[in-house]
Amino acid sequence: VIRLGKLHEQFGTYEMNGIGFQDVNEIWWLESIGGHHWIAKRVPDDEVVVMPNQQGIDYFDLCDAFGEQKEHLCSQDLLSFITENHLDLTLNEERDVPLAKDTVFDCRLAFGSHDDADHTYNTPRAWFMLRYLAPFSYKWEGPDAIFRPEDDDLPWSLVPDRKVTVEDVKYLLSSHYQGTPYDPYGRGSEAQKGKYRPIGINRTNFVALTQLRPYMPPEKMAVEWIAEGCNVYNAFVPFYANVDRTPEYLSQTGELPDTHEFYWANRLIGALADSHHAATASAIERYQNAVAAKGRALLQEGDKADLPADGVSEALAQWNDKIASMAQEETQKALGKVLYEASNGMKNSFARSDA
């Protein structure tokens, strides 16, 4: 985090951006705030962060950032940057401490965007994810809701109502406002359906999750969960990360569509299933559940298997090959089922009984 911050101060950037850092002990989130300025905050151990495409860190402890730096870091000139550009939007009567001693400085208010576009593109996605993660801790809907889809003060992080699983992450990154009037596949009014940008959107190429498992030996600790194509219809596959090569099913993606490649097979599944969402829903759900269950089973086998003294990476790569073979088999079966339903639903279908 500090190294990237120093590079940022030296070279700068032309846009705001964010990046997460993690090891087995902690997670930090760094945000560039334009030019040569940056902030970073340690994610509390019992909290989750929800980050759409906008500046996200809300409350920032400037006292810690310029003091012990236990949970907050920033560029050295941040205080002068705030002061010289009049970015402290706290009302004078509310500011009872010097800026350098402020423990709850609102970075999102000072540096972030609050555009109308955010209220269709960003805040609704954060609202849906936070609503899923903490459904009982806050009121999310109705006239007495604490947080609504277009609010600018949605929390950057919160304590979820329960522990978060890999499957939860996949569901959220595939979501399209299920159970709300805003679901483009749902039964809401035309004015509400498609009102907000879904999280699982058609142009997604891949999604990944890095899982660090402290209960495993170091060589097997890191697992990368990968899905390719549109998240609504694809499946999460686990792979050992401590390897020097990737299974050909994933690594040999060409420019032309090919059903023998994970990416293209999933792109085809998504394109076919989208127009027949209800008819293919069962096949998609079975596909996603089968890959997740069989992937976990193979991962558990690999976790228990002995590794050679030499060639650890290749041994784990061979387990990845087994997992990729399973994923290919399940993907081909899903493609066949989706193609069958889509073919039956073509507009030029006709039966003798229709005459």
Describe the predicted segments one by one.
Residues 26-30, 37-40, 49, 59:
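Structured soluble/peripheral alpha/beta segments that form catalytic or ligand/cofactor-binding pockets
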Residues 35, 46-47, 216:
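Coil-to-beta-strand transition motifs
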Residues 2-36:
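Gly/Pro-rich turn-and-neighbor structural signature
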